[in-house]
Curated annotation (Swiss-Prot):
Chief location of this protein within or outside the cell: cytoplasm
Domain of life, source organism: Bacteria
SUPFAM superfamilies per UniProt: Thioesterase/thiol ester dehydrase-isomerase
Designated name of the protein: 3-hydroxyacyl-[acyl-carrier-protein] dehydratase FabZ
Keyword Lipid metabolism: yes
A GO molecular-function descriptor: (3R)-hydroxyacyl-[acyl-carrier-protein] dehydratase activity
Enzyme class: lyase
Record-linked Gene3D superfamilies: Hotdog Thioesterase (3.10.129.10)
Length: 150
């Protein structure tokens, strides 16, 4: 077990992120090193609402939702690195570079998100992010999130 093992459950995640069903895409955080990295997961089930139309006969998780889940994990890392989310602030997904999809994600898979902080300047963080299934990379990208007062 990692020295940075934590167990942040969905209730605590909901205190960090404003997302709610059906758009909350992180179920649990299993490791975190503030200002460095986070490891989180999502259990993908046939009950996900997007499987109704993507695709009925061959359900595949949309790649953009995997990217969104990685951005949510990056947001949790950013928020937990500063302590807690302030009531009047949100973290917005503002950019993506070098996105690649390498494996389909289907019902029954467990997505493991590994996000590493690259830089933070003027409230904008850049993160190297990977989503894995059974140790295989399903998606990788560099993601940018910005902290904004609302």
């Amino acid at each position: 077990m990692s020295e940075h093992a934590v167990s942040i459950d969905v209730r605590e995640i909901m205190r960090c992120l404003p997302h709610r069903y059906p758009f909350l895409l992180v179920d649990r955080v299993t490791e975190m090193e503030p200002n460095v990295r986070i490891k989180a997961l999502k259990n993908v089930t046939i009950n996900e609402p997007f499987f109704v139309g993507h695709f009925e006969q061959y359900p595949v998780m949309p790649g953009v939702l995997i990217i969104e889940a990685l951005a949510q994990a990056a947001g949790i890392l950013a928020i937990k690195s500063q302590g807690e989310r302030l009531e009047n602030e949100l973290y917005f997904f503002v950019g993506i570079d070098n996105a690649r999809f390498k494996r389909q994600v289907v019902p029954g898979d467990q997505l493991v998100f590994e996000v590493t902080q690259m830089t933070v300047k003027r409230g904008i963080g850049k993160y190297a992010a990977r989503a894995l299934v059974d140790g295989q990379v399903a998606c990788e990208a560099e993601i940018m999130c910005a902290r904004r007062e609302v």
